């Protein structure tokens, strides 16, 4: 068979195999188009589970007459025009394949009118070449799409359709997911002429829990712990059910959204599961409705034709961010109740050294009274009840920050600290005016060596070795401990009994090195590290450090600092002149003994005399 270009209808039918899996897939694509068009009301009419009719009617901006034919063409879209648009996509659709694919396996009719047009127009495609016919029609501003006889021309696909009830249940689930993503849109779902679901638009933030209860049920609403967690460009909002009261019925509620797009992402599910693992049974699953907001440039949605999956550019950061956000609200729920002194009129719950969900470690409350309220992770329709201070909250309810006054002062001090890093404590007196130095940097050789000129001699200096000595000097405490830098997202690791015992024995020494942690039964939470470790991959470095400590019988700060300095990763895979000059200036200031007596592997003289003699001619 010779190579030939496929007919448009066949090409679209092949694409439909990826996009149009069942009637619910059609509903998803068409409703998302309505939302992208700015619709505030979408009516979905279904007959015979979607096999006979799928009608989507919206009050969006509509489609111009001259663009109707393009709307049914493959790879035609109004949502992106360049690669930059694709890399920063915020609309739900962008591939330009849905309508063409659907029309190739059904009898599709598109009717639309814009506010500028006096009349509406109707388009439909038919035949082998998918020729589009456009004619006048009566229709208000907005768009209606009718999909008749789905898979009528692909009998093999039609055989795989399930019963009418099963297919409609899938459609119902899609509408539930969309309703949770867009509280500002009214969604009406009808089946065989009967209104089955009606989700009214939320006028105020305080009514969101009403729609949440209508979709997820009262049991989930009663056990929901609100989350609002933020760090940099990442924001996590929503609800997670209290694992201590999660039932089998609730475990079916697992809804996750990335920038408003419904997702089934293993990374997100793993982070949530890991945060709840200590409170869930082996056969239990967490229940949650979570919304992740992230810079569109940091996530790739062009992974799956149906757009069910995403790929994060910094997946480890996203995983840890979600894990810490969920873990924080769960820990607030289970903290032991402690009395407050001069903070609240009655004994209230104060989680020691904890933060409110949705706040970073350095967040300062807008009002002083905000810090005086305990965490309020649950809410219900009524006022406080028998569960101890359950309150109804408006909008995105979240736990109020609870911490002690002394901790608040520490956080304010941290906030007022200049962004420039303080100079590390010198381990030896600095050289006066750099009377002794390595010399002048001439160039970089091999990417990690500096060619130096000093007093008429030429030397090669290993920059990674110099950096290791500098780190050891920065990590070794002088007259005072090394300054600890709190982590915005603490690192929680599972440890063995031997590792936990070693950490407890070395805790005071690690504190002098700027490493602060808290431990519980099976885990250790790293809360602060010294400045040289802030940019390191702590997920790898800290477990290796714990393993090293578990193998030691005695501990010394110098040995621990030396081990860390040897095992940290260099921040400079390729060195520049400016970086080399800055490094040598720091080494000369903090490690003058290296200038006087360079250790092995740091400096290597270059014999210029031999080279010059080789060039001399008789």
Swiss-Prot record:
Gene Ontology cellular component annotations, sorted alphabetically: mismatch repair complex
Region annotated Disordered, chain positions: 366-403
GO terms under biological process: mismatch repair
Low complexity bias: start-end ranges: 366-378
Molecular functions per Gene Ontology: ATP binding; ATP hydrolysis activity; ATP-dependent DNA damage sensor activity; mismatched DNA binding
Family, per entry: Belongs to the DNA mismatch repair MutL/HexB family.
PANTHER family registered for this protein in UniProt: DNA MISMATCH REPAIR PROTEIN MLH, PMS, MUTL, DNA MISMATCH REPAIR PROTEIN MLH1
Protein name, as recorded: DNA mismatch repair protein MutL
Name of encoding gene: mutL
């Amino acid at each position: 068979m010779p190579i030939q270009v496929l007919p448009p209808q066949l090409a679209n039918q092949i694409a439909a195999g990826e996009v149009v899996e069942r009637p619910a897939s059609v509903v998803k694509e068409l409703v998302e188009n309505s939302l992208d068009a700015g619709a505030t009301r979408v009516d979905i009419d279904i007959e015979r589970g979607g096999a006979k009719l799928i009608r989507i009617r919206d009050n969006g901006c509509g489609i111009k007459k001259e663009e109707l034919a393009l709307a049914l063409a493959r790879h035609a879209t109004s949502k992106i025009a360049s690669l930059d648009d694709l890399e920063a996509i915020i609309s739900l659709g962008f591939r330009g394949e849905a309508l063409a694919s659907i029309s190739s396996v059904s009898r599709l009719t598109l009717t639309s009118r814009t506010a500028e047009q006096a009349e509406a127009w109707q388009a439909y495609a038919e035949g082998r070449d998918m020729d589009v016919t456009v004619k006048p029609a009566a229709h208000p501003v907005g768009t209606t799409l009718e999909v008749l006889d789905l898979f009528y021309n692909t009998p093999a696909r039609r055989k795989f359709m399930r019963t009418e009830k099963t297919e409609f249940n899938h459609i119902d689930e899609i509408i539930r997911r969309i309703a949770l993503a867009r509280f500002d849109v009214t969604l009406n779902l009808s089946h065989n002429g009967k209104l089955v679901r009606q989700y009214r638009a939320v006028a105020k933030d305080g009514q969101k829990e009403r729609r949440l209860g209508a979709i997820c049920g009262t049991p989930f609403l009663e056990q929901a712990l609100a989350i609002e967690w933020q760090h940099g460009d990442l924001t996590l909002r929503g609800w997670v059910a209290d694992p201590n009261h999660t039932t089998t019925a609730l475990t079916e509620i697992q809804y996750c959204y990335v920038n408003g797009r419904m997702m089934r992402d293993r990374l997100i599910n793993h982070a949530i599961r890991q945060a709840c693992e200590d409170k869930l049974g082996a056969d239990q699953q967490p229940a949650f409705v979570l919304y992740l907001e992230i810079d569109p440039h940091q996530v790739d949605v062009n992974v799956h034709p149906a757009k069910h999956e995403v790929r994060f550019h910094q997946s480890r950061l996203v995983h840890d961010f979600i894990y810490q956000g969920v873990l924080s609200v769960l820990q607030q729920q289970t903290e032991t109740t402690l009395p407050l002194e001069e903070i609240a009129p009655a004994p209230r719950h104060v989680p020691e050294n904890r933060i409110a969900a949705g706040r970073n470690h350095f967040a300062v409350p807008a009002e002083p009274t905000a810090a005086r309220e305990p965490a309020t992770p649950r809410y219900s329709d009524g006022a406080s009840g028998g569960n101890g201070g359950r309150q109804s909250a408006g909008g995105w309810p979240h736990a109020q920050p609870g911490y002690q006054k002394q901790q608040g002062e520490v956080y304010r001090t941290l906030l007022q600290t200049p962004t420039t890093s303080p100079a590390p404590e010198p381990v030896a007196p600095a050289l006066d005016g750099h009377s002794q130095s390595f010399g002048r940097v001439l160039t970089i050789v091999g990417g990690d060596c500096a060619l130096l000129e000093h007093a008429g001699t030429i030397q090669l200096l290993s920059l990674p070795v110099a950096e290791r000595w500098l780190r050891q000097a920065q990590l070794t405490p002088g007259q005072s401990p090394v300054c600890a830098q709190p982590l915005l997202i603490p690192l929680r690791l599972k440890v063995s009994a031997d590792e936990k015992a070693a950490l407890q024995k070395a805790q005071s020494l690690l504190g002098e090195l700027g490493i602060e942690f808290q431990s519980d039964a099976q885990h250790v939470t790293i809360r602060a590290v010294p400045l040289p470790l802030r940019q390191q991959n702590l997920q790898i470095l800290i477990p290796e450090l714990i393993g090293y400590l578990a193998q030691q019988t005695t501990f010394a700060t110098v040995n621990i600092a030396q081990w860390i300095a040897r095992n940290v990763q260099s921040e400079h895979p390729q060195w520049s002149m400016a970086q080399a000059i800055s490094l040598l200036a720091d080494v000369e200031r903090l490690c003058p003994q290296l200038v006087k007596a360079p250790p092995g592997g740091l400096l290597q003289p270059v014999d210029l005399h031999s080279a010059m003699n080789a060039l001399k001619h008789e």
